[in-house]
Design a protein with these regions (language model features):
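Long hydrophobic alpha-helices with heptad-repeat/coiled-coil character
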Residues: 12, 44-45, 100
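Short, low-complexity N-terminal intrinsically disordered segments enriched in polar/charged residues
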Residues: 1-34, 84
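Short, cysteine-centered beta-strand-loop-beta hairpins and adjacent loop/turn segments enriched
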Residues: 95-101
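A solvent-exposed, acidic/Ser-Thr-rich amphipathic alpha-helical stretch
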Residues: 25-94
Length: 101
């Protein structure tokens, strides 16, 4: 992996956060290849799984549309590149603000 690989891969994580926080689901989709592996087991209790990027983006829409605001903060990226495959593992803090009634 060279420096440019690292920069481009970590840039995707910022686009991921911006896509979710702005409800720009086209931007969110553009971050991913067609098949992805997502691991939110610590959050949801569901085991990590492969799914299509479209499935992931569609599953995000009902979670974020209608919120007053969100902010996703990501740190400590660990990037690995092997041939044409890359992975990025990181910590994320997500803040979700609801409309007051």
């Amino acid at each position: 992996m060279n420096k440019q690989d690292f920069v481009e891969i970590t840039q995707r994580r910022y686009e991921y956060a911006m896509g979710i926080d702005s409800c720009n689901f086209d931007l969110l989709r553009s971050v991913f290849c067609d098949e992805i592996f997502m691991d939110f087991e610590d959050y949801s209790g569901k085991p990590a799984a492969k799914l299509s990027a479209e499935e992931w983006v569609e599953s995000c829409k009902p979670l974020f549309i209608g919120l007053k605001a969100t902010q996703h903060i990501m740190t400590n990226p660990i990037v690995e590149v092997e041939g044409n495959t890359a992975s990025c593992q990181m910590h994320m803090q997500a803040l979700h603000f609801f409309e007051e009634n």
